[in-house]
From Swiss-Prot:
One of its GO terms (molecular function) is ATP binding. This is Carbon catabolite-derepressing protein kinase. Belongs to the protein kinase superfamily. CAMK Ser/Thr protein kinase family. SNF1 subfamily. One of its GO terms (cellular component) is nuclear envelope lumen. It comes from Candida albicans (Yeast). InterPro entries: AMPK_C, KA1/Ssp2_C, Kinase-like_dom_sf, Prot_kinase_dom, Protein_kinase_ATP_BS, Ser/Thr_kinase_AS, SNF1_UBA. The lineage of its organism: Eukaryota, Fungi, Dikarya, Ascomycota, Saccharomycotina. Signal peptide: none annotated.
Length: 620
């Protein structure tokens, strides 16, 4: 494992970084220290320690919890600890899904993606041990201004290769921005927050985070369309390339609505000093209509992009492997058994044999079960990781050590839940790794898989091509069925003017005695509702929550066609802290029962709202 040297920074630079990060969470920080990593005395400050990691400082806070800088007691290697609060996850009913997705993300091994080394679980927290990078591309641009095209292209090639790698394995970032692009000591890009902070949860068609005027969301994100797909990453990568080449943002306005209008209209200028090739690529990426936007694979075929392209960044030739037999690699199987908890004979080998039989018969592997497809995806991903490492070792690059995907630091946490610690050190919590995963049948279905695009016309064309040619990379395609003209949507559709639709919803909510939060400027088409529901029939304890929360959101399906979506958002007590008089165990039991006893309260209130809307439309 190559040790990572930390950059030196002046007080002014540190202050700039502090000001810049006040609304972000990251896995890096500039340190005033020598470049040599010195192991920490095992007896030092045991209270501020998690396992064999000594916590040094807090780097920031995210939506799930805090991010801390830590150092391994034995090796002195610095890592970032992303500490996720289980209670926060439980409120959104995401814990099982997050654990499953984290275990999948542990398999991601690309030279230009921040690596998830390990996952530690305690009773109250899930702790992710993450690769630590000390610099940020944003600061590099601020200090140097616009870059020469050769330098910008080198960074851009690394970014696109990492994005392509994740898209190929059904993960989309959706939050690419300079702050998420870190640099190691060899000035190689490391993309942070790939996957975890952008988990596509059921019921959330779109999850935006516009915390800064510098954030450049894609036009389809701003318009609030029913959409979440890889085209968003292409737009963001185009913005990043523009910033590197021009030293400024393509769209800039201190007034957020004016900024979003410029983005939606695609209003930007290209400096004359840019080469024709750079201009051509930017104009293909910064396209308002995602249907016409260049794809990641088309970017990788662009002449300007391909100049001086290192071989290790080239994706594998999938066309050669489309109908080829899958080899059984014992090293990969062994690693997959440890990482994901799959049984060798009953699970992994069996799935590979079934897939090979289907290939031999000319059938698609999509006919396998969802859990089998998941195992096959994980096996192929890890097999590609092994091949990537072999290719990198053959490379003649001078900075090969910084390219190699590092292994996790030596973990003191055995797979079966026991925790070792330094002699004389008493730990307040017992941690276990996530290496042994429960049976797949006990966990929610993973939502990490995505379609190549959610856009209707492209999706229809893609599915038609898949049906004709077959595509093992899209493991989750359903078997061919008779084409139906019926179009299904979750929610109710309307062709009325959007503001009229929202007005009718507010009027119906008022008539039914519901409450709602005042919407922010960024969420004009979202209503957060609180509705009293009678729980007295189910619970004798007065501490049981009786306010059901619902989120109502308006989406645009196509021109002049809109969708109203209803989503259950949990429970809340009408008595505030009045329930604290009852024992904690009783309150938790009530909460558990309310959260699991039935879906009918939500369906009942949603039905009442839909009926009220129908009555209002008839009377109007």
């Amino acid at each position: 494992m190559s040790e990572q040297a930390q950059p030196q920074a002046s007080a002014d630079q540190q202050q700039h970084q502090h000001n810049h990060h006040h609304h972000h969470h990251h896995h890096h920080h500039n340190e005033n220290q020598s470049q040599q990593q010195v192991p920490i005395d095992p007896a030092a400050n045991p209270a501020n320690r998690i396992g064999r990691y000594q916590i040094l400082k807090t780097l920031g806070e995210g939506s799930f919890g805090k991010v801390k800088l830590a150092q391994h007691l034995g090796t002195g290697q610095k890592v970032a600890l992303k500490i996720i609060n289980r209670k926060t996850l439980a409120k959104s009913d995401m814990q099982g899904r997050v654990e499953r997705e984290i275990s999948y993300l542990r398999l991601l091994r690309h030279p230009h993606i921040i690596k998830l080394y390990d996952v530690i679980k305690s009773k109250d927290e899930i702790i992710m041990v993450i690769e630590f990078a000390g610099k940020e591309l944003f600061d590099y641009i601020v200090q140097r201004g616009k870059m020469p095209e050769d330098e910008a292209r080198r960074f851009f090639q690394q970014i696109i290769a990492a994005v392509e790698y994740c898209h190929r394995h059904k993960i989309v970032h959706r939050d690419l921005k300079p702050e998420n692009l870190l640099l190691d000591d060899q000035l190689n890009v490391k993309i942070a927050d790939f996957g975890l902070s952008n988990i596509m949860t059921d019921g959330n068609f779109l999850k935006t985070s516009c915390g800064s005027p510098n954030y450049m969301p894609a036009p389809e994100v701003i318009s609030g369309k029913l959409y979440a797909g890889p085209e968003v990453d292409v737009w963001s990568a185009g913005v990043i390339l523009y910033v590197m080449l021009c030293g400024r943002l393509p769209f800039d306005d201190e007034f957020i609505p004016a900024l979003f209008k410029k983005i939606s209209n695609g209003v930007y200028t290209l400096p004359n000093y840019l080469s024709a090739g750079a201009k051509h690529l930017l104009t293909r990426m910064l396209v308002v209509n995602p249907l016409n936007r260049i794809t990641i694979h088309e970017i990788m075929e662009d002449d300007w992009f391909k100049q001086d392209m290192p071989d290790y960044l080239l994706p594998p030739d999938l066309s050669k492997n489309k109908n080829s037999k899958i080899d059984v690699d014992e090293d990969v199987i062994r690693a997959l058994s440890v990482t994901m908890g799959y049984d060798r004979d009953c699970k992994i080998v069996n799935v590979i044999e079934k897939a090979n039989k289907q290939v031999a018969a000319g059938n698609s592997s999509s006919q396998q079960s969802k859990s089998s497809n998941e195992i096959l995806d994980a096996y192929l991903l890890m097999k590609e990781n092994h091949a990537l490492v072999k290719d990198l070792k053959k490379s003649k690059s001078e900075n090969i050590e910084s390219f190699l995907s590092q292994s996790p630091p030596p973990s003191p946490f055995p797979n079966r839940g026991s925790t070792s610690s330094a002699p004389g050190v008493q730990q307040s919590l017992t941690y276990q790794t996530l290496a042994t995963v429960p049976d797949l049948s006990t966990l929610p279905n993973s939502t990490i898989a995505i379609l190549p695009t959610s856009l209707p016309s492209i999706h229809r064309a893609y599915m038609a091509e898949t049906k004709q040619n077959g595509d093992p990379s899209q493991q989750h395609a359903p078997p061919p069925t008779k084409k139906s003209k019926t179009r299904w949507h979750f929610g109710i559709r309307s062709r009325s003017y959007p503001l009229d639709v929202m007005g009718e919803i507010y009027r119906a909510l008022k008539n039914l005695g519901a409450e709602w939060a005042k919407p922010t400027e960024e969420e004009l088409w979202t209503i957060r509702v609180r509705w009293k529901y009678d729980t007295s029939a189910q619970f004798e304890c007065g501490s049981a929550p009786n306010l059901m929360k619902m989120q109502i959101q308006l989406f645009q399906l196509e021109p002049n066609n809109y969708l109203v979506s209803f989503k259950f958002s949990g429970w809340e007590s009408a008595h505030g802290n009045a329930g604290t008089d009852s024992p904690q165990s009783h309150r938790q039991q009530d909460l558990d029962e309310v959260g699991s006893f039935s879906a009918y309260p939500f369906l009942h209130l949603a039905t009442r709202l839909i009926m009220e809307l129908a009555v209002n439309s008839q009377s109007g």
